[in-house]
């Protein structure tokens, strides 16, 4: 079985993330969205909230893939992959600047555990999109409705209103 991990913090998941996950689901028998837990990073949503938002966004997606799982990832992504028999990592690239960092990570992951990384170019309509940018725009009252799944938009508005 060809299995891949799509790692990230997904705080929150964006339509750009969703696009990469759905496209990866067509290339692999199973895709595991690995929601990273970084105790040094302050997140808007807890890991459980992020995982549930991803599950709901996938269920609501018009091309709802049935071969995507969502799980929490502690520590190195290669350890996550190794413990689950995952051979590949899928990463979306928005710009050339992403490639420099991601190439180093891919080479390190391959040297540590023989895990291959597949780079997918981001759909041009999402090339500028990041979770950080979504949160910043939303905090200042900007409209992010076309940038995140509806379920995320609702939770984002509620969280920022607190």
From Swiss-Prot:
Keyword S-adenosyl-L-methionine: no
Pathway where it operates: Cofactor biosynthesis; coenzyme A biosynthesis; CoA from (R)-pantothenate: step 4/5
Cofactor(s) the protein requires to work: Mg(2+)
GO molecular function: ATP binding; pantetheine-phosphate adenylyltransferase activity
Family: Belongs to the bacterial CoaD family.
Catalyzed reactions per annotation: (R)-4'-phosphopantetheine + ATP + H(+) = 3'-dephospho-CoA + diphosphate
Enzyme class of the recorded protein, top EC level: transferase
Subcellular location: Cytoplasm
Protein name, per record: Phosphopantetheine adenylyltransferase
NCBIfam families referenced in this protein's UniProt entry, alphabetically: coaD_prev_kdtB, cyt_tran_rel
Function: Reversibly transfers an adenylyl group from ATP to 4'-phosphopantetheine, yielding dephospho-CoA (dPCoA) and pyrophosphate.
A cellular component term, taken from the record's GO annotations: cytoplasm
Binding site for ATP: 9-10, 17, 92-94, 102, 126-132
UniProt keyword annotations, A-Z: ATP-binding, Coenzyme A biosynthesis, Cytoplasm, Magnesium, Nucleotide-binding, Nucleotidyltransferase, Transferase
Positions marked as site (Transition state stabilizer): 17
Gene: coaD
Principal subcellular localisation of the protein: cytoplasm
Subunit structure: Homohexamer.
Biological process (GO), any one: coenzyme A biosynthetic process
Residues bound to substrate: 9, 41, 77, 91
EC number of this enzyme: 2.7.7.3
Domain of life: Bacteria
């Amino acid at each position: 079985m060809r299995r891949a991990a799509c790692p990230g913090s997904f705080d929150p998941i964006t339509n750009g993330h969703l696009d990469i996950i759905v496209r990866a689901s067509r290339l692999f028998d199973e895709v595991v969205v690995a929601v990273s837990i970084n105790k040094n990073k302050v997140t808007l949503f807890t890991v459980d909230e992020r995982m549930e938002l991803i599950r709901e966004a996938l269920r609501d997606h018009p091309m709802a893939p049935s071969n995507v799982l969502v799980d929490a990832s502690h520590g190195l992504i290669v350890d996550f992959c190794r413990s689950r028999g995952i051979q590949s990592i899928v990463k979306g690239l928005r710009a050339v600047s992403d490639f420099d960092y991601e190439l180093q990570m891919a080479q390190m992951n391959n040297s540590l555990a023989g895990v291959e990384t597949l780079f997918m170019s981001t759909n041009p309509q999402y090339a500028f999109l990041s979770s950080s940018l979504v949160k910043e725009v939303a905090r200042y009252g900007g409209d992010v409705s076309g940038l995140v799944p509806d379920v995320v938009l609702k939770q984002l508005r509620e969280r920022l209103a607190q």
